[in-house]
């Protein structure tokens, strides 16, 4: 499964493009999702029931200039639900994983919320995409998360970059949280 964006087969500017291939790379199906604005996917994972969860950003839907979009599909790429998260400024998701209870954890970037010019955002949802909690992490500079994984203790490990902390410009930033998104350590 491959996720990204396309201008060639879109309803508007760019649309989210999801392609399912067989083991030899032959296309089994391809789907586009989006509206009249720019929509892009940065992460896709197969879910426990054989469907897919897609995360990215949308300028077609939501509350702001660019919002996080989460799309849940069946095994054939048909939308089961789609949700947006964000504020009046730019928000983006770079990583999504299904959690052990069937919900989702989403990591990315927000300039709508947090302490600085842009902060890491971590959103925990239930199986239907409803927010259980959302947390931001960062300082007065810029932070962005590119990957999130659930850990064996039920918490999360988040990898990204920081401009606020560290020795230089855009250092690697690793955050370990508990199951509720509270920081246990950050390095």
Regions found by a protein language model. Give the residues of each.
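A sequence-level/structural motif corresponding to short, flexible coil/turn segments enriched
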Residues: 1-187
